[in-house]
Swiss-Prot record:
Lineage: Bacteria, Pseudomonadati, Pseudomonadota, Gammaproteobacteria, Enterobacterales
Binding site for ATP: 30-37
GO biological process assignments: DNA replication; DNA synthesis involved in DNA repair; double-strand break repair; SOS response
Protein family membership: Belongs to the RecF family.
Function: The RecF protein is involved in DNA metabolism; it is required for DNA replication and normal SOS inducibility. RecF binds preferentially to single-stranded, linear DNA. It also seems to bind ATP.
PANTHER family in the cross-refs: DNA REPLICATION AND REPAIR PROTEIN RECF
Residue spans crossing the bilayer: none
Protein name: DNA replication and repair protein RecF
UniProt keyword annotation of ATP-binding present: yes
Gene Ontology CC terms: cytoplasm
Length: 362
C-alpha cells in the first residue's frame, strides 16, 4: 500500500494540513521545532494509535482543541489493487475512533495491518542499548504481521499475567495460582515458539544486511525466550512461587524474552560507535521491512527522523541507495535540503516545513 494523501488536524503544532504524497521519497525539510517530526508522528499514529514520542493523547492534541484527527488515503501498487480510506481521531481522555472506508467501530490493529511501517529515529538506539522490551517489540512486530493468531495470544498473555500478579499477592500456596497458570503455560509456549521461528527465519536477512552496512563486523542474532531453555515452564512456575510472591510479579516467561545481537562475539552496545549503532539500527529495520515484503507481497513504509544525525555523507548515501532499492515509500526529515539533495529524483517530493505550515516545493 502507498499512503497517497495525508490529512492532519490539531496534531502537535500542525493546525491543519492536506498533503499529496509521492510514491517514493518524501522529504520534510525545515529548522528544529518546525513540525517535521510532527508529520512523521502523525503518520506513525495513524498506523499505531499512538505517537512515538508520547503515548498520552493530551500531549499531541493542540492547545484549546478536544481531539486530533488524522486521515489517510491508501492506494494499491497497481490499478487492480484496491485502495482504502482510513482515519483515526483521539480525544483528551484517550478515546479513539477508527474509521476504515467510511465505517466506524474498527480496531487499531486493523490500521497496523493496512499500514505496516518501520521507524528510525535518534531515540531508536534503545533497540540496541535499551532494555529487552524494545527488542521484544521488534520481534513481535514481525510475529504480528506473519502469524494471524499472534495478536490475540499476545493480548491474552498480558491479561493473564496481570491477573496472576494480582493473585500472587493474595495466594498462600501455589495451588491457588493453577487456574491462571494453565492458560499462562499454553500462551507462553505458543508465543515463544512463534518468536523463535520468526527470529530463525529473519536471522539471515539481518546478518546479510548488517554485513552490507558494517562489513568490518560479523553480526549474529539469537533469541532468548525468557527462561532456561532446558527447564519445563510449568515446573519453573511452581518452583519460582515463593520468589515471585515476594516480588509480587511473575519473574520469568515470554514477557522477559530478548533478542541478543553480537558483533564479533561481543554485545553490539559494547563494541560499536554511535554512528555504527545507527547504521546497525537502520540495517535491522531495513532487513525486517524487506523480509516482510518478501513474505507478504506488501511493501513497508519507512519513517526516518533527523536523517543526517550520526551519519557522514558516505553512510547517508549507502542508506539512501538501499532504501531506494526496496521501491518502498519513504519519509525523511532533515534540517536543510542540502542533506538530501543527492536523493531527489522524479519520484520524490520535497516539503518545506516552518512553524507547523507545510509547503510543497517544486
Amino acid at each position: 500500500m502507498i499512503l497517497s494523501r495525508l490529512l492532519i488536524r490539531h496534531f502537535r503544532n500542525i493546525e491543519q494540513a492536506d498533503l499529496p504524497l509521492a510514491d517514493g521519497f518524501n522529504f520534510l525539510v525545515g529548522p528544529n521545532g518546525s513540525g517535521k517530526t510532527s508529520i512523521l508522528e502523525a503518520i506513525y499514529t495513524l498506523g499505531h494509535g499512538r505517537a512515538f514520542r508520547s503515548a498520552q493523547a493530551n500531549r499531541v492534541i493542540q492547545h484549546d482543541e478536544n481531539a486530533f484527527i488524522l486521515h489517510g488515503r491508501l492506494s494499491g501498487l497497481d490499478e487492480e489493487s484496491r485502495g482504502y480510506s482510513i482515519g483515526l481521531s483521539k480525544d483528551r481522555e484517550g478515546n479513539s475512533t477508527v474509521r476504515i472506508d467510511g465505517s466506524d467501530g474498527h480496531k487499531i490493529a486493523e490500521l497496523a495491518k493496512l499500514l505496516p511501517m518501520q521507524l528510525i529515529t535518534p531515540e531508536g538506539f534503545t533497540l540496541l542499548n535499551g532494555g529487552p522490551k524494545y527488542r521484544r517489540a521488534f520481534i513481535d512486530w514481525g510475529c504480528f504481521h506473519n502469524e494471524p493468531r499472534f495478536f490475540a495470544a499476545w493480548s491474552d498473555l498480558k491479561r493473564v499475567l496481570k491477573q496472576r500478579n494480582a493473585a500472587l499477592r493474595q495466594a498462600s500456596s501455589y495451588r491457588q495460582l493453577l487456574p491462571w497458570d494453565k492458560e499462562l503455560i499454553l500462551l507462553t509456549e505458543q508465543i515463544s515458539q512463534w518468536r523463535a521461528e520468526y527470529t530463525e527465519d529473519i536471522a539471515k536477512d539481518i546478518e546479510e544486511t548488517c554485513q552490507l552496512f558494517l562489513p568490518e563486523f560479523t553480526l549474529k542474532v539469537s533469541f532468548q525466550r525468557g527462561w532456561d531453555k532446558e527447564t519445563d515452564y510449568a515446573q519453573l512456575l511452581e518452583r519460582q512461587f515463593e520468589r515471585d510472591k515476594v516480588l509480587s510479579y511473575t519473574s520469568l516467561g515470554a514477557h522477559k524474552a530478548d533478542l541478543r545481537i553480537r558483533a564479533n562475539g561481543t554485545p553490539v552496545e559494547d563494541m560499536l560507535s554511535r554512528g555504527q549503532l545507527k547504521l546497525l539500527m537502520c540495517a535491522l529495520r531495513l532487513a525486517q521491512g524487506e523480509y516482510f515484503t518478501r513474505k507478504n507481497g506488501q511493501r513497508c513504509l519507512y519513517l526516518l527522523d533527523d536523517f543526517a544525525s550520526e551519519l557522514d555523507a558516505n553512510r547517508r548515501q549507502l542508506l539512501a541507495e538501499r532504501l531506494k532499492s526496496t521501491q518502498a515509500q519513504v519519509f525523511v526529515s532533515a534540517i536543510t535540503s542540502g542533506q538530501v539533495k543527492d536523493m531527489l529524483d522524479v519520484n520524490s517530493r520535497l516539503f518545506s516545513v516552518e512553524h507547523g505550515k507545510i509547503e510543497v516545493k517544486p
